[in-house]
Amino acid sequence: MDHYRPSVGTKISELDTPCLILDLDALDHNFDRMSETFKDTKVKLREHTKNIKSPALAHMQIRKGGTVGGVCSAKVAEAEVMVEGGIASVLIPNQVVTEDKIKRLCVLAGRADVTVCVDSEENVRDISRIASNLNVKVGIAIEVDTNMDRGGVRSVEQGVHIASIANQLSGLNFRGVMSHSAMFGVPKDDEFKNDERLRSRFVFA
């Protein structure tokens, strides 16, 4: 049986929500602008699917050029949707730590080129164990904390240690490091004096 889909010409007031409604001319213009920005550079774009939500739109953007040929998805469930829709490369820029989700991650890695971020030796070993059992390879990128306090290593030594472990274990492909845009402000002197945690965020030359 075919899945129900709203027909062309359905009134906006009759559409179920949530519903993706696009101005295709504006979408095409935006994709062209992004493609033109990146296509002649060494830096390529990996669109985050929280912006587009749809494998069809991801394919449209990839065809425009200027991308790495894949997307970024916040969690395993979103990555599954993208791979099911034919996207060949997915980066998950967060840690995947529970046994069940690591298994789903590894199953996905058997269908597409999948990279996930890590910030602990324990997580790296868990992913390696499950990936090896399923005879797949999972890409590993070390997340670097850039003062967002969301995750990531906070020292060069920690990052080097995790990288060396990842390079030694089976079932893994070490891909490098990843970080979010740095979050720096200019705190007042008294804030430094009274907040040791704040002081630890800043390195002065």
Regions found by a protein language model. Name each.
Residues 1-107:
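A charged N-terminal "starter" segment
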Residues 27, 31, 54, 75, ...:
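Aromatic/hydrophobic pocket-lining residues that form the small-molecule binding cavity
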Residues 40-41, 65, 132-137, 167-172:
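Short helix-capping segments at alpha-helix termini
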Residues 44-46, 68-70, 89-91, 113-115, ...:
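Structural preference for beta-strand elements that scaffold enzyme active sites
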Residues 52-54, 74-77, 95-97, 119-123, ...:
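Active-site beta-loop-alpha junctions enriched in small/polar residues
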Residues 57-62, 102-106, 124-134, 152-163, ...:
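Distinct, well-ordered alpha-helical segments
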Residues 139, 146-205:
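Active-site loop/helix belt of alpha/beta enzymes
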